[in-house]
Amino acid sequence: MKRNLKILTLLCLAAVLLAFAGCSTGKTENKEPAKDYTLPEAVADVRDQAMDYVQDYAKKLEGGWTDRLEILISQNLGEATMNSSEYTALSATLTSYMKECGATYMYALVPDSEGSYYITVDGSEEPDTWGTDYGSEVQFKEAFEAGLVASARSGWQDGEGKWCWSVFSPLYNSNGNIVAILGIDYPAPVLADYPEWDRDSESWNGLDT
């Protein structure tokens, strides 16, 4: 009887161990694989090219052009600013640079008192209205607050379905103060092959910070 009881005890113990092992295996199988946020080389090449451009053009706009932008901002005329000859002149400079480097869009942003960024001068053929709210994104803050040449974490599609990658650089006045940021939306058709890096795609990886 004792021997049978001992055998029964051992069998019960074995059953418990097997059940525990089964539960552990099940937990391992249910683990989701870690997401890979490594930017593909082909996409990184586009981003890096755009960052070189925005840094170079911000340097060209430093001082004179940015001083004039600062004056326009200080006048606080809102949408009426776009009717001025000075706005037209500043916009023409951005349009020239935009065509020179092949950018899709080129514009200047400044933050408001709430930390949201709005557009000022826009070099596009159909410019956004002065004061259009662009919200607040980490790359805006990196450029304006930290003085960095900054990149968006993912690309996007404009209203015509064109893929773009956005980059930003601080704009300094003659006193060495950052008064705005220059933005370039650069063509990124390579995103057709990497939809996980397109925030307007259903396959987007969700990386935005």
Segments predicted by a language model, with ranges:
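C-terminal motif of bacterial Sec signal peptides marking the signal peptidase cleavage site
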Residues: 19-22
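Extracytoplasmic/periplasmic sensor domains and loops in membrane signaling proteins
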Residues: 122-157
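Bacterial signal peptide processing site
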Residues: 24-26
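Short hydrophobic/glycine-rich mini-motifs in sensory/regulatory modules
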Residues: 172-182
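Helix-start (N-cap) segments at beta->loop->alpha junctions
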Residues: 184-201
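Extracellular/periplasmic ligand-binding regions of membrane signal-transduction receptors
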Residues: 36-87
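Short N-terminal helix-loop-first-beta-strand/juxtamembrane motif that initiates sensory/input modules
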Residues: 56, 95-116, 201-209
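A short beta-strand signature within small-molecule sensing/ligand-binding domains used
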Residues: 161-170
